[in-house]
Curated annotation (Swiss-Prot):
GO terms for molecular function: ATP binding; ATP hydrolysis activity; proton-transporting ATP synthase activity, rotational mechanism. InterPro entries: AAA+_ATPase, ATP-synt_VA_C, ATP_synth_F1_bsu, ATPase_alpha/beta_chains, ATPase_F1/V1/A1_a/bsu_N, ATPase_F1/V1/A1_a/bsu_N_sf, ATPase_F1/V1/A1_a/bsu_nucl-bd, ATPase_F1/V1_b/a_C. GO terms for cellular component: plasma membrane; proton-transporting ATP synthase complex. It comes from Neorickettsia sennetsu (strain ATCC VR-367 / Miyayama) (Ehrlichia sennetsu). This is ATP synthase subunit beta. F-type ATPases have 2 components, CF(1) - the catalytic core - and CF(0) - the membrane proton channel. CF(1) has five subunits: alpha(3), beta(3), gamma(1), delta(1), epsilon(1). CF(0) has three main subunits: a(1), b(2) and c(9-12). The alpha and beta chains form an alternating ring which encloses part of the gamma chain. CF(1) is attached to CF(0) by a central stalk formed by the gamma and epsilon chains, while a peripheral stalk is formed by the delta and b chains. It catalyses: ATP + H2O + 4 H(+)(in) = ADP + phosphate + 5 H(+)(out). Pfam families: ATP-synt_ab (PF00006), ATP-synt_ab_N (PF02874), ATP-synt_VA_C (PF22919). ATP binds at G153, G154, A155, G156, V157, G158, K159, T160. Gene3D superfamilies: 2.40.10.170, Bovine Mitochondrial F1-atpase, Atp Synthase Beta Chain, Chain D, domain 3, P-loop containing nucleotide triphosphate hydrolases.
Length: 474
C-alpha cells in the first residue's frame, strides 16, 4: 500500500493540522510521523476537517515544528512492543525505550494500542481473594483476583506509596508479571519506583528478561496526547501476557484521574463543547473504552489497581464518580486518618469490596471483619458525645468500645517495605491467617490489658505482644 504524504498547515500547541493533497486521507486514530529537528515525532489523527485536512494530536512536544514540514501516514494506529522483551524496561506512549538501555530484541513484535474488549463467552467470573499482606485491605476491603480496585484519595495521602507496596508484595508473594502505567504523575516518583524495583530485585538490570515488571510512563511534563494514550499502551502489553502467555497479570495505573484530565485538555483543543465541571462530553465513553479491556478471560486474568486522585477531596466530582461504576473494590484513603499518623491511611468504614461475603471469604473472616467494622462504627457515633461531654460521661460498655476501637485503629497501621528508607522501620508482610487471628483476639477482648501504643506500626499480634512487654519494662 502506498504511503500517504501530507504537509503541516497549522500548529496550535499539541494539535497539528496536516493537508493531504492526493485525496487518500489517513483514518481516525492512525499514527502519523514527522521529522522534528532530527527526532521522529508521532501524531495521532483525531479529526478529519474536510478539504484534505486532518487534525492530529502530538505525542511529544511540538516545539520547533514549522508549516510545510512533510508528514507520513503509517497506515496503522500507534503500535508498542509486546512479550517478554518488554520486562524490566521503561517505555513511553509510542513504545520507545526511555531507560537509556539498548533496543528490544524483536522490534517487529508489536501490537496496536487499540483492541476490542474480550467477548462475553471468553470472559471468566470467578471470585478468589488476592492476598496483599496489608492488614487493613485483606481484612476489611479485600481485592479479588481479576478484579478492579480503585485507590481514592486527595493530594499527599499515600496513594503512590500504597501502589508501590502492592507491586513489591505481590511480585514477591506470587511471582507474577506486573505492568505499571505512570499517567501524568511526577517524574521523580517514576524514577524512585524504578530505583526501588532494581534494589528489591523486581527488576534485574543485568538480565531484564528475568524481571517481573514493565513500566510505561507518560508523566506530568508530557503533552495531553501522551497522557491520554499511555494507559492504552501499557494495557496492550498486559493483554499480551494474559492472552498469549496465559498469565495472571497485575496492571497498575497511577493516576486514572490524569487520564481523564488529559482527555479534557484534548477535548478543548479539538473544539468540543465541554460537559459538567469542564470535562469532555465523551468522559463516560473514554473511561469505558479503557476499563472494558481490563478483565479476566478463560486464558488468564488482569487484576488492576488504579490510583484515583479526588480533586479538592470531592468524591462526587465527575472524574472519580465515572470510575466508580467500573470497580469491584474501593480503598478510600483519608486525610483525617493520615493526620492521626496512621499509615496506610485507609478509611476502614468508607472502603468496600464486593467479595466481602461468607461464600467467598469463609465464615470466620466475614464475622471478624463485620465485628471490627461494628466497633469502629460505634466509636464514630460516640465521638460527638466524647467531644462535648468527655469520656467520663460514657457508660462502661461504651468506654470499652472506645478503648477497643482505638486499639483496632492503631493495629490497622503497618510499616511498609517501600517506606523503610523514610521511617527506618523494616516493612512487614502479614499473612491473611495472622490478620484474622489478630483482629479476632482484639474484638473478643483478649487484648484489653495491653496498652494502645503496643498496636501501632506492628505486623501480627505476636509483635504487638512483644512491643507491649518492652513498653511495660520502660
Amino acid at each position: 500500500m502506498p504511503v500517504s504524504i501530507g504537509k503541516i498547515v497549522r500548529v496550535v500547541g499539541p494539535t497539528v493540522d496536516v493537508k493531504f493533497e492526493d485525496g487518500t486521507l489517513p483514518k481516525i486514530e492512525n499514527a502519523l510521523t514527522c521529522d522534528n529537528n532530527g527526532k521522529i515525532l508521532y501524531l495521532e489523527v483525531a479529526q478529519q476537517l474536510g478539504d484534505g485536512i486532518v487534525r492530529a494530536v502530538a505525542m511529544d512536544s511540538t516545539d520547533g515544528l514549522t508549516r510545510d514540514k512533510v508528514v507520513k501516514d503509517t497506515g496503522k494506529p500507534i503500535c508498542v512492543p509486546v512479550g517478554r522483551q518488554t520486562l524490566g524496561r521503561i517505555f513511553n506512549v509510542v513504545g520507545e525505550i526511555i531507560d537509556g538501555g539498548g533496543p528490544v530484541p524483536e522490534p517487529n513484535k508489536v501490537s496496536s494500542i487499540y483492541a476490542e474488549p474480550p467477548r462475553f463467552d471468553m470472559q471468566s467470573t470467578s471470585s478468589e481473594i488476592l492476598e496483599t499482606g496489608i492488614k487493613v485491605i485483606d481484612l476489611l476491603a479485600p481485592y479479588s483476583k481479576g478484579g478492579k480496585v480503585g485507590l481514592f484519595g486527595g493530594a499527599g495521602v499515600g496513594k503512590t506509596v500504597l501502589i508501590m507496596e502492592l507491586i513489591n508484595n505481590i511480585a514477591k508473594a506470587y511471582g507474577g508479571f506486573s505492568v505499571f502505567a505512570g499517567v501524568g504523575e511526577r517524574t521523580r516518583e517514576g524514577n524512585d519506583l524504578y530505583s526501588e524495583m532494581v534494589e528489591s530485585g523486581v527488576i534485574d538490570k543485568e538480565h531484564p528478561e528475568k524481571s517481573k515488571v514493565v513500566l510505561v510512563y507518560g508523566q506530568m511534563n508530557e503533552p495531553p496526547g501522551a497522557r491520554a494514550k499511555v494507559a492504552m499502551s501499557a494495557l496492550t502489553m498486559a493483554e499480551y501476557f494474559r492472552d498469549k502467555e496465559g498469565q495472571d497479570v497485575l496492571f497498575f495505573v497511577d493516576n486514572i484521574f490524569r487520564f481523564t484530565q488529559a482527555g479534557a485538555e484534548l477535548s478543548t483543543l479539538l473544539g468540543r463543547i465541554p460537559s459538567a465541571v469542564g470535562y469532555q462530553p465523551t468522559l463516560a465513553t473514554d473511561m469505558g473504552r479503557l476499563q472494558e479491556r481490563i478483565t479476566s478471560t478463560k486464558n488468564g486474568s488482569i487484576t488492576s489497581v488504579q490510583a484515583i486522585y479526588v480533586p479538592a477531596d470531592d468524591i462526587t466530582d465527575p472524574a472519580p464518580a465515572t470510575s466508580f461504576a467500573h470497580l469491584d473494590s474501593t480503598t478510600v484513603l483519608s486525610r483525617q486518618v493520615a493526620e492521626a499518623g496512621i499509615y496506610p491511611a485507609v478509611d476502614a468504614l468508607a472502603s468496600s469490596a464486593q467479595i466481602l461475603s461468607p461464600e467467598v471469604l469463609g465464615q470466620e473472616h466475614y464475622e471478624v471483619a463485620q465485628k471490627v467494622k461494628g466497633i469502629l462504627q460505634s466509636y464514630k457515633s460516640l465521638q460527638d458525645i466524647i467531644a462535648i461531654l468527655g469520656m467520663e460521661e460514657l457508660s462502661e460498655e461504651d468506654k470499652l468500645t472506645v478503648y477497643r476501637a482505638r486499639k483496632i485503629e492503631k493495629f490497622l497501621s503497618q510499616p511498609f517495605h517501600v517506606a523503610e528508607v523514610f521511617t527506618g522501620q523494616p516493612g512487614k508482610f502479614v499473612s491473611l491467617k495472622d490478620t484474622i487471628a489478630g483482629f479476632k483476639e482484639l474484638v473478643e477482648g483478649k487484648c484489653d490489658d495491653m496498652p494502645e501504643a503496643a498496636f501501632y506500626m506492628v505486623g501480627n499480634m505476636n509483635e504487638a505482644r512483644e512491643k507491649a512487654i518492652s513498653l511495660r519494662e520502660k
